[in-house]
Amino acid sequence: MKKFVSFFCLLSLVGCSADDLPKYSDLGGLRVLALVSDNGGFAEYSPGDTVQITPWISDFKGGTRTIESSWQACIDPGITVGADPTCTGVPGATAVTTGAVALPVTERTGSVGTFSVSIPSTILDGRNPIEVYNGVNYLVTYSLKASDGATTASFKRLQVTPSTKTGKNRNPTLNDLLAGGTSLTTFPSGEVELRASNAPGSAESYTRMKNDGAMENRTEGLVTTWFITTGELTLFRTIEDGITKWTPGSRPTDHTPLVLGVTRDGRGGISAVMKSGL
């Protein structure tokens, strides 16, 4: 049985070095860290489902500026074959919904207001058997704009398969962030090994239909992305139960340190845990 590690990590392995970390794992400016979708724990949906989207964002060094969000949804225009991740001009796209973002109190980082997306009941109509079995993507775009003009954007693809399908993908469960094998609860005095503690069964096995109609067995590969407000990491992404070493340095006096982990299963499933008040 083949194991498929999330493509975004494979493509970035050349960048998983300390030289790149300040550009990615260090929290500072306005960022969308994850868009977690959920419907009863599932990360794979059926036509007509209403899906809850919970953004995880950070504006750690944003001061007192205010943030406005906007989102839109549409059938995926073909991102995997080069289309831009946008709903602009896509037939059947929803209207753009905007609103003020209530930023988390803790260092302006964490989960913010959930919004609901309704998947069209006709999304699978006219699709060929391979598309129906493997799933059709429903695209959700999400953007943020700060009162001083700073902007950022992200997107989420919701995998949609028939309601009769069994064994649909579920979100992984990131139970805890470990430091030296125990729960990270205090600011370390020196270098520690960080590890994501995912619940058993979070990496699921599934089948996918190939272009010739044959079935292929696969197993998800869990990838955890790490974010920090101080110190340095040796890796900003770890695979499965791999470790990254965190050298926190002296405890900062200008903010309360935090560490955030986001686990992805490569099929749209996401789980996030933040350790604050360290």
Predicted regions and their residues:
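C-terminal motif of bacterial Sec signal peptides marking the signal peptidase cleavage site
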Residues: 12-15
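Bacterial signal peptide processing site
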Residues: 17-21
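Short, solvent-exposed loop/linker segments at the N-terminal edge
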Residues: 41-50, 184-191
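Extracellular acidic, Ser/Thr/Pro-rich low-complexity tracts
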Residues: 57-63, 75, 198-204, 214-216, ...
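Solvent-exposed loop segments of extracellular immunoglobulin-like
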Residues: 63-70, 219-227
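Conserved structural position at the C-terminal beta-strand
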Residues: 144-146, 261-265
